[in-house]
Amino acid sequence: MRISPSEAAMKLSLSPPPYADAPVVVLISGLGGSGSYWLPQLAVLEQEYQVVCYDQRGTGNNPDTLAEDYSIAQMAAELHQALVAAGIKRYAVVGHALGALVGMQLALDYPASVTMLVSVNGWLRINAHTRRCFQVREQLLHSGGAQAWVEAQPLFLYPADWMAARAPRLEAEDALALAHFQGKNNLLRRLNALKRADFSHHADRIRCPVQIICASDDLLVPSACSSELHAALPDSQKMVMRYGGHACNVTHPETFNALLLNGLASLLHHREAACKELL
């Protein structure tokens, strides 16, 4: 994948390594694109790993005007190039929804670099229900603009009782999201890239270990999508959270973090040990 000079300058946020040669974990958010999505995971991850967060191209502190044909492959290529420029050659990926798609693309295109993948509420190709949800959200965007999109978004991310107990927090988050809205064109081009992505014929070529985490009450992405992903991948394990919704890492971080840390410890460290034995 060819990267333009502007794309090559994508900014990353790197935590200090907790010890020499600490494994690197790259966090990739979903359609919103903001690295701050992973705030509930940072403190625990940074104790064991060097953590990379970033705002995706066209969002936050990486502003840009995206091409109409912008793709998941481009998202993967520009991230990999930014990591290489930062001196990072091997890394694990934790991706949420769209971020999980980018993670799979990285594993396919740069197999020598990706040590492990964690897919959070991801999929092989977009499910009919997920497509329907996005059609409704697109209609809201076209008819009501950014404010309608932002105000509807929590309905697809969080369980109803969790939202009801946190109304002031959600109002504050809505205001922040509206102030930092990525723009209609960029959002639609990123969404179209998500909808076009199809790994159903390529997932069996992903050789790194994959941890799959999903929530059974996810309104946007049915948990069956993670089951299909699990069946298609050669080396994967699947964990199901009974509660948490699409943004389960935000709504139930204690449970999610425990699953994530255990998965990284068992799969990533096992893979690294095996690689060292081969050297």
UniProtKB/Swiss-Prot annotation:
* Superkingdom assignment: Bacteria
Alphabetized, the UniProt keywords read: Hydrolase
Gene Ontology biological process terms in this record:
nitrogen utilization; uracil catabolic process
**Presence of the UniProt keyword Hydrolase in the record:** yes
* Annotated catalysed reactions: carbamate + 2 H(+) = NH4(+) + CO2
Q: Specify the AB hydrolase-1 domain's residue ranges.
A: 23-126
Its name, as the record gives it, is Putative carbamate hydrolase RutD
Lineage of this protein's species? Bacteria, Pseudomonadati, Pseudomonadota, Gammaproteobacteria, Enterobacterales
Which gene does this sequence derive from? rutD
